[in-house]
Amino acid sequence: MTTRYTINPSLRLCTWCLVVGWHEVKDSFLQSESIFSCEGRSIYTKGDRCMIMAQVNEKRIDFYYCHDTKFDNRNIQSWLRNIIKNKILDLANIELPKRLHYWEKEKNLYARQVIIKKMKRRNIWGQCSIYKQIFLPPKIVVFPLELIDEIILHEMSHLKFMHHRKQFWEYFSFLLGRDAKLCKMKESVFFAKYDEMIEFLLK
C-alpha cells in the first residue's frame, strides 16, 4: 500500500475525546467473540474467518486482532480507516458544537450557526462568515482541548472583527486571557507534527 501511514498497533491515538486501543488475542477468542453481535461491534472477515474486530464505544475504539492479522492488506487498511474516520466525524458533530456553545455562554457572544465541514484547504482550521456562521473542520476534534478552544475563540473574535488587524488581535487576546499571537506558534508546531496523519485518517 503506497502511503506514508499504515494503520496498525503502532498507531497511538489518545486524545481528550477519543482513545484507540489495540489488543492482540488468541485466534480462538477472536473467532468465538465475532459470532456474537452487539452495539458498536464490527468485524472484518476473510471467508468465514474473522481477521480483526472493532468495538466502538462513546469515546473509544478497541481493535482485537491475532498474531497473523495482515495489517498491510489494502482491504484491512480501508476497513480500519473507515472505522476511525466515522468515529471522528461522529464525535466532531457532537463535541465541537458543544464546545462552541460553552464558550458562547462564557463570553456572552453568539454565532448565528455552527457548521461542521471539511475545509477546502488543509491549513484552514476554522472560518467565520459575514453572516456570523462559524465553520469548523471535523479533524480538529482530536486536537488537544486547549488548541480547540483557541481555534473556537479565534473564530468567535471574527464575530466582532472580520479582519486580522490590531483590533482583532486585541479582542482575541481579551477573550483568550493571554497574548493571542503566541497561539500561532503553538498551532504551527502541532500542524507540522500531526496534521498529515489526521488528514490521512479522514480521507
Predicted segment positions?
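Active-site-proximal or metal-binding-adjacent scaffold patches in catalytic folds
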Residues: 1-150, 159-203
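Walker B catalytic acidic pair
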Residues: 155
